[in-house]
């Protein structure tokens, strides 16, 4: 009779066969669990993504070269800066023009000698010493001037306004009532203002421009170019 030990122990070949069968069974069970594990992983991933804010997900998908929207306040700042810059430039230009005009005015009127009055680019002097027409012209020449003439309406209005109630000799003369009026430089008068009377020498009176006898003594008006204007020309 064989011993009980020999009956309990399986043969070595049978033992190896059982071990291999157990391993294959274990592998099949592991494979069958594969889809379930994958589903669980995907479910976990989905739940994680659902917790991520939608705006961040979209921001991550945008290309980096596309800028985000600027706030409206930033554009307002740009507009304010541009407007202020334009205003500063305009103010600077206006101040520069005003300063230039002031300098021009100072140069026009300040270059006349003392007691002379500047009008445009001319200087006028009201001589209060009565003299005849010829002596009055001589006194004006001694100061580098001539008996006054008017070339513009501005000068004419000035003479009328400033002379007061006295009569003043000015630079018109003629040979006779049949001849044209001429200035002291012998240029012909254009008769822009009529001169009353039949005498040979012109003077400015309360009634306007009149003619008188040259030997009568009157005050006189001298005129010469503005010295600054003469230098610039």
From Swiss-Prot:
Glycans are attached at residue 132. Residues 119-228 form the C-type lectin domain. It comes from Rattus norvegicus. Lectin-type cell surface receptor. Residues 98-233 are extracellular. Gene3D superfamilies: Mannose-Binding Protein A, subunit A. This is C-type lectin domain family 2 member D5. Pfam families: Lectin_C (PF00059). Residues 30-50 have a biased composition (Low complexity). GO terms for cellular component: cell surface; endoplasmic reticulum; external side of plasma membrane. Keywords: Cell membrane, Glycoprotein, Lectin, Membrane, Receptor, Signal-anchor, Transmembrane, Transmembrane helix. InterPro entries: C-type_lectin-like, C-type_lectin-like/link_sf, C-type_lectin/matrix_domain, CTDL_fold, NKR-like_CTLD.
């Amino acid at each position: 009779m064989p011993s009980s030990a020999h009956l309990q122990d399986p043969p070595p070949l049978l033992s190896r066969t059982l071990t291999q069968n157990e391993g294959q069974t274990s592998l099949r069970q592991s494979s069958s669990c594969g889809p379930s594990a994958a589903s669980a992983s995907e479910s976990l991933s989905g739940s994680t993504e659902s917790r991520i804010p939608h705006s961040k997900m979209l921001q991550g998908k945008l290309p980096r070269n596309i800028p985000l929207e600027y706030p409206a306040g930033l554009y307002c700042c740009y507009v304010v800066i541009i407007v202020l810059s334009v205003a500063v430039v305009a103010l600077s230009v206006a101040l520069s023009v005003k300063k230039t005009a002031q300098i021009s005015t100072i140069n026009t009127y300040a270059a006349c000698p003392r007691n002379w009055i500047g009008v445009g680019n001319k200087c006028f002097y009201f001589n209060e010493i009565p003299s005849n027409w010829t002596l009055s012209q001589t006194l004006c020449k001694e100061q580098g001037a001539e008996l006054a003439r008017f070339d513009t309406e501005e000068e004419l209005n000035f003479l009328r306004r400033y002379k007061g109630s006295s009569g003043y000799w000015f630079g018109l003369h003629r040979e006779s009532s049949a001849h044209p009026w001429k200035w002291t430089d012998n240029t012909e008068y254009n008769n822009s203002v009529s001169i009353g009377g039949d005498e040979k020498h012109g003077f400015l009176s309360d009634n306007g421009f009149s003619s008188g006898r040259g030997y009568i003594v009157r005050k006189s008006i001298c005129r010469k170019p503005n010295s600054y204007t003469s230098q610039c020309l």
